[in-house]
């Protein structure tokens, strides 16, 4: 490996070789970020898929009866996707969201998981997922980005019409306010975070323009830091209407995927159709948010692979890189593009004498560290503490927890599990992973003597 240091002009020349990304080319909005400017569809337009809509709307009641949801889904015809869906991306997203909800309900209903999805779900789910460039199960996109509606489209506030009091979910597993709130806090998070994209591109344009005095770079960094601070506060709003025990015992089991699920009787994952292949996928997770990974790219935060944190148990696999596969194709491609041209941290390290620049960048890192501290606090309250409690609870009594690695087939949610072993819905060990992300964020601030030999 060549350890020769790269001079400032060389760094800038290297990144100038490729144009900066244009948000709209990647289905990203300057006003709403990774949320579409158009609201998600609340129903498919064709009556052909009316049964899908009826079942997903009725999931909260169907899941109250043993195997009821499975018997209803098993009675469905296998439907092909027609032009009403194939010709409109919002129809595709709606179909994908519906099928993801039904798939997870079918697998995890009644506490004893099934390892085969019926053809009536498997075939259209595989097709919609392939077209959208996402895995065939419920993801952050289907649960959050494409699963909300506004209650008053005329209501305009600081965040347009997407304030928490003006949005609600389209579908949930449990019908609880807690589950809706869990998704909606992330919707608002994404809306606030749209400013991060604009500030980041402002900084990169200023660096390329050779802005003397770095005024625009500093201004962009200050705006970015202020927005990350707002994101931290938005995250803590989870506590307002989502109870930890309701989340952990009633909601979270349905969010699990089929990775690391041998203890639940899914050693090969789930088979898609009676004649299909077994596939292994991680469940819906905030690690699948393109916004969070955008912040890391902009600020130059590097995350290392760790076998204990990977959902695949492979030290060569970086969990956050893995999660890019769960994002909509265009958003994933945006991250790759941004990563190839982003040189903010390098630029700051080359201008160590500019105190205002150093302080502005340092504040961004400090705010991102606080955000990750808050995330650890939320995870502790909503996952670690309930997992260590003796309370038994679920949408049904004696329901197994698919997200506890030591749960046995004859057991139930109530036994004690060590916090370091607690597995996230994405299949990774939560606290070690989150603390590593936080520590790697802090380490990013140390740039004083970088690139000096």
Curated annotation (Swiss-Prot):
GO cellular component: cytoplasm
Record note on cofactor: Binds 1 heme group per subunit.
Binding site for heme: 331
Single Gene Ontology BP annotation: 'de novo' NAD biosynthetic process from L-tryptophan
Annotated catalysed reactions: D-tryptophan + O2 = N-formyl-D-kynurenine; L-tryptophan + O2 = N-formyl-L-kynurenine
Record's note on what induces expression: Expression is mediated by the AFT2, HCM1, and SUM1 transcription factors. Up-regulated in absence of NPT1.
Enzyme Commission number: 1.13.11.52
Pfam families from the UniProt entry: IDO (PF01231)
MF terms in GO: heme binding; indoleamine 2,3-dioxygenase activity; metal ion binding; tryptophan 2,3-dioxygenase activity
Cofactor(s), by name: heme
Family statement: Belongs to the indoleamine 2,3-dioxygenase family.
PANTHER family xref list: INDOLEAMINE 2,3-DIOXYGENASE (PTHR28657:SF5)
Major enzyme class: oxidoreductase
Role summary: Catalyzes the first step in tryptophan catabolism in order to supply de novo nicotinamide adenine dinucleotide (NAD(+)) via the kynurenine pathway. Plays a role in the cellular response to telomere uncapping.
Gene that produces this protein: BNA2
Pathway(s) per entry: Cofactor biosynthesis; NAD(+) biosynthesis
Additional comment: Present with 149 molecules/cell in log phase SD medium.
Protein name (record): Indoleamine 2,3-dioxygenase
